[in-house]
C-alpha cells in the first residue's frame, strides 16, 4: 500500500481571523484540520447558547463557510443576519441551521459533520471541546469579568484569562489531530478571546507543546481595542507563553506593509509594532513579509501569501491542486 504523503496541517483559533487563513490553505494539497474555540457568548451565538444550552455556533459556522465549496449564494444565505425586531433579531441563519442539526443528531460534532457534507468543505472542523465553558478575565485592577463578550469592553488592561470549569476536557479528535500534525498554526485572531481559550484546555496545550511539528503563530496586523492596545508582535507571543506556562512557539509570520491611515478605524486601532529584540529574547524566528490585504477596504491577512509561507516550513512545499 502506498504511504500517505500529504502533510497534516492543524490551524487553531476562532473569530474572524482564522477563516481568512483557511481560505488560502484549503487550496493546497494537504490534510487540513481547524480546531475552533467555543468560548463565544455574545450576539446570536450567545442567545442560542443561553436558550438551547448548546455550544455557540458562530465561530464554527464562519470556519465551515471559509472551507466550503458551494455556490456563493449559499454562503450569503448562511451568513444572513436578521435585522428585525423580535425573537429573530440579530440571529444568523447559519447559526440556527447548525443548532437545529445538533438537535437532529446524536451530538454537536455529528451536526458539524453533517453540515460539512452539505457545504462540501475541504478539511475537517473540530470544536476545541464539546463541553460548555465560560471565559473569565482578571483585569489589572483586580476586578474579574465573566464572559468572553464582556472582556474587551472594560477599557482596562487584562492580567490573565481563565476558563470555568478549569478541568474542561478537549475534544479527543482535536488532541489526535495535534498529535498527528506536521505543522501547527495558531491564529490570527483576538488574542485573549479567540486564541487563548483553546490553549487553556490543558490536555490540548500539553499535546501542542510536546509536538515535534513546527509551531507557528500568525501575528495580528492590528491591535484590538480592549485586548491588545499598544501591544508589539513580541507581546502577543509573550502572553501566550505565560498562559500556557512554557515557551513553545517556534516561528511567527509578521506583516511588514504599512496599513493605509484611512483604514485605521476606529481611531484607537493601530498597527502592531515590531519588536525584533523581543522576538530574539523569546527565541522565536520572525518571518517578515508583505502579508497585507486591503480588499474591500478591510485590513486582513493575504490568504494566499500566508498559505505559501506556512507550507514553505514543511520539508516538502505543497503546491496548489490542479
From Swiss-Prot:
Subcellular location: Cytoplasm
GO terms under biological process: regulation of cell shape
Keyword Cytoplasm on entry: yes
Pfam families in the cross-refs: CofD
GO MF term list: LPPG:FO 2-phospho-L-lactate transferase activity
Keyword Ubl conjugation part of the UniProt annotation: no
Function: Required for morphogenesis under gluconeogenic growth conditions.
Name this protein carries in UniProt: Gluconeogenesis factor
Species this chain originates from: Listeria monocytogenes serovar 1/2a (strain ATCC BAA-679 / EGD-e)
Amino acid at each position: 500500500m502506498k504511504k500517505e504523503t500529504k502533510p497534516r496541517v492543524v490551524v487553531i483559533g476562532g473569530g474572524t481571523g482564522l477563516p481568512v487563513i483557511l481560505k488560502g490553505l484549503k487550496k493546497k494539497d494537504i490534510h487540513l484540520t481547524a480546531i475552533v474555540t467555543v468560548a463565544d457568548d455574545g450576539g446570536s451565538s450567545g442567545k442560542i447558547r443561553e436558550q438551547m444550552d448548546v455550544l455557540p455556533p458562530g465561530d464554527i459556522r464562519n470556519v465551515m463557510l471559509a472551507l466550503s465549496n458551494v455556490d456563493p449564494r449559499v454562503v450569503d444565505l448562511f451568513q444572513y443576519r436578521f435585522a428585525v425586531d423580535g425573537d429573530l433579531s440579530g440571529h444568523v441563519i447559519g447559526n440556527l441551521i447548525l443548532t437545529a442539526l445538533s438537535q437532529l443528531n446524536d451530538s454537536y460534532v455529528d451536526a458539524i459533520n453533517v453540515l460539512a457534507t452539505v457545504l462540501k468543505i475541504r478539511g475537517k472542523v473540530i470544536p476545541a471541546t464539546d463541553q460548555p465553558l465560560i471565559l473569565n478575565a482578571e483585569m489589572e485592577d483586580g476586578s474579574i469579568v465573566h464572559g468572553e463578550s464582556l472582556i474587551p469592553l472594560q477599557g482596562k488592561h487584562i492580567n490573565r484569562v481563565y476558563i470555568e470549569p478549569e478541568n474542561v476536557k478537549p475534544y479527543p479528535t482535536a488532541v489526535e489531530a495535534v498529535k498527528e500534525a506536521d505543522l501547527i498554526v495558531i491564529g490570527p485572531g483576538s488574542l485573549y478571546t479567540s486564541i487563548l481559550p483553546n490553549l487553556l484546555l490543558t490536555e490540548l496545550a500539553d499535546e501542542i507543546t510536546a509536538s515535534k511539528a513546527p509551531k507557528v503563530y500568525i501575528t495580528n496586523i492590528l491591535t484590538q481595542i480592549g485586548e491588545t492596545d499598544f501591544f508589539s508582535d513580541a507581546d502577543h507571543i509573550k502572553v501566550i507563553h505565560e498562559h500556557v506556562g512554557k515557551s513553545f512557539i517556534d516561528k511567527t509570520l509578521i506583516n511588514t506593509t504599512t496599513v493605509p491611515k484611512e483604514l485605521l478605524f476606529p481611531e484607537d486601532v493601530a498597527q502592531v509594532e515590531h519588536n525584533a529584540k523581543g522576538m530574539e529574547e523569546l527565541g522565536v524566528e520572525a518571518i517578515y513579509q508583505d502579508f497585507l490585504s486591503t480588499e474591500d477596504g478591510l485590513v486582513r491577512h493575504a490568504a494566499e501569501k500566508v498559505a505559501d509561507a506556512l507550507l514553505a516550513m514543511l520539508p516538502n512545499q505543497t503546491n496548489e491542486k490542479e
